């Protein structure tokens, strides 16, 4: 039996519904074993824009009822409170609430074994918060729903892979909370993740915090007090890890094949190089959950929502990768 992937709609006022339809209606994923969790009426409104050739929406109650065939998209309906009031490209509380409910439903299905992985379309954090769900993003929400203590965001392309020590936290607060335990945990998670996806002997680089990785304490002492001891501790456990590496060169070295993954210290340190080099094919993966979760590596793109202009490549790759890793 094929592994079933739950695909969550994300914010319905963004490009999520469109990139899901484009991903599942055409190409390699047409007829794939994926079940959408989202608002049926919103999907119908997107289909009315003729973004793809004719496709059938099959409403199901549970994944076991799905019929996987070309031209068919299976969907478990999570209705909006007022679907006709939904407007594209605008922050709306009901859209944030729907995105939350879709994640909650998909997580319950995964924890029950009814689906084997989750691929998520982007949500809008402001809309999520306006609905009363005060999470920084998907990663933290999924960790809460699954009671996962140790987790990390991975950005994944064929040529560059990055895992983050911190993500949705103010840079000033990151510097105040950085500690050896977290750095060592993320290095270990990187090693486990890479082995899970097929690397037999992963090579992991750990980026420094400061310019030139601190230049032996000239530009900060986080490398001396935290990063270097963490790297040495993980080497003692048998992990092939290097660092602290200067952040301005380590990503190029990884891109050219010297390392299999970079441990980034904070959000933009990891996101900028990966989005520069792999914006359209990058995938976001949450390491440390009890199931595989992947996501398109971009936002809701409100400026082009419901226009037919959204590119589905990152969403399609995230679904394919979820199937591969499940």
From Swiss-Prot:
Keyword Metal-binding: yes
Cofactors: a divalent metal cation
Superkingdom per UniProt: Bacteria
Membrane-spanning segments: none
Binding site for substrate: 138-139, 275, 284, 293
GO molecular function terms noted in the UniProt entry: metal ion binding; NAD binding; oxidoreductase activity
Entry's cofactor comment: Binds 1 divalent metal cation per subunit.
Family: Belongs to the PdxA family. PdxA2 subfamily.
Complex and partners: Homodimer.
Summary of the function given for this chain in its UniProt record: Catalyzes the NAD-dependent oxidation and subsequent decarboxylation of D-threonate 4-phosphate to produce dihydroxyacetone phosphate (DHAP). Can also use 4-hydroxy-L-threonine 4-phosphate as substrate.
Protein name: D-threonate 4-phosphate dehydrogenase
Organism: Pectobacterium atrosepticum (strain SCRI 1043 / ATCC BAA-672) (Erwinia carotovora subsp. atroseptica)
Lineage: Bacteria, Pseudomonadati, Pseudomonadota, Gammaproteobacteria, Enterobacterales
